[in-house]
Amino acid sequence: MKKKWLKKSSAILLSLTMVLSLFPGMNGTIPTVQAAEKTSPESAYWTDVSGLKSFSLDETSDTEGRIIFGQNGSGAAQQWKIAGIDSGINGDNIILFAASPLGSSAFQKEYNTNKPYDPNWNCTYPDGTIVSEVFPNHYGVSDLRAELNTYMRDNSYFSESEKTKMNQTTIYTDDKNNSTTYSVTDILYAPYGDYYRPNDKYVTVGTNTSDKLNGGVMINISKWGNDIFWLRSPSDTFKSKALVVCPGQSVCADSVEDINSLVPAFDLNLSDVSFASAAEAASSSYSGFKANDTDNTMTANTYTLRYKSSGNEEAVISLNGTEINVKNANEKYLMVQNNNGVYALKIDSDNQTINASDIQMGSAESDKLANFNNCKVWLESTNADRITTAKMAVTTINSIEITDITAPVAGSAFDTEAACATTGVSTTTPTVTWIHGGESVTGNAGYNTKYTASVTLTAKAGYEFASNVKATMDGKAASVTKNQDGITVSYSYKKTAPKAVSNAYFATVDDLKDCYNI
């Protein structure tokens, strides 16, 4: 136990020494006064998928998270509020609720007469239900639903690539004429609501069930916006009325022939999203430095998604953090983001080195970076379908030092814990596995036996092992094997001592076997 504690302590002390040596102004034991270092961007300006999934709209106090996705039909970018996660849909996802109307429509222009049922509406009723006609406030046949489906047919609202990121959602609604419920499966859909207190102060989006129509993800009255918009819910008392949102008041009813806004929801697939930034997608018109919350170019909690890139571009940060080597990224943009804002730099060759001092995060000379520490750095490009793909920069680990392994001693327990203080390695006290004859061994070491120590290491996020990474084990050159999750470092120790023969003139067969490891 004491030995293990000493190993951990030495590894921690060595790590601290290495970290402190990277700080400007630390020279020996005498610090010098320097300008304050920049810090990493706050989550309001840069977040991963888990951060996106943490937003909700069910409380007045909730901070609104927004995603820029698609257009509003007139060529302007459309913003969507993050309502939460749809537990009825597999995989990483969030429900998006339009932050402003996509258009307007009547719920149903033909409001006076019932409609004969048509299977082409693709409404699914409970088994055995016979439906011959429906009321004018039936969502499945409504002009409202037809208009929302129209938005998915051309590219005025969503590009073909954007449409592939949108999940279908199965939603239930009530059929008042037939005293039952039915479901439809669409991408864009109207929210559900109830005008009976206290349920009239929220609406719901996402997957629901036939026995809990208002059981989706809640959106509080304070998050509805300023427009009267249609819900998919029919009125309980009038077949020619359906429910709407009356901003700041409640859910209420309106005649189906009236024109109201369309504020739909949909489910966004996050499976290939890498991260999101408040920085807009870089372009010739969006480059250079952009400060947080300035000229609406970096708005807190309003994100542009960055999808995972499958390209061979790479940005490698030097171990001291002062430069980046960029390869295979001609015509892409290098993005550097910290707590001040973001800097977008166009790459104009396939092999380019960028110094930290080339990036100025503000108007003053002192805003030039000394290093890329505490920055989010990535390469990105945006295609004609408005899909931005990105690849995070990494710091390459070129050499590994593993220490504090005690060589095997015959008759004694193997040392199973090493120390590693190399920057970027995920653990400072890796486990040692001992190999003999191609098999792992435990317990005590044998006599006159050669053992190989094997240590598997993984890199921290933002680091990767170089293809030709070198390693030493207690100062001696070791072999390195790269694997899917990291590297395995191996070193073969000398044979353990032979077992002494107790009688110099007489030895049993067992004595000889122990002595020579037969």
Please report, for each region that a protein language model flagged, where it lies by residue:
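Collagenous Gly-X-Y triple-helix signature in extracellular proteins
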Residues: E37-K332, V336-T395
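Solvent-exposed, low-complexity, repeat-rich "mucin-like" stalks and linkers
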Residues: I397-G424, P498-I518
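Serine/threonine-rich, repeat-prone extracellular segments and beta-strand-based repeat modules
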Residues: T431-S454
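Conserved "repeat-terminator" motif of extracellular CCP/Sushi domains
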Residues: K482-A500
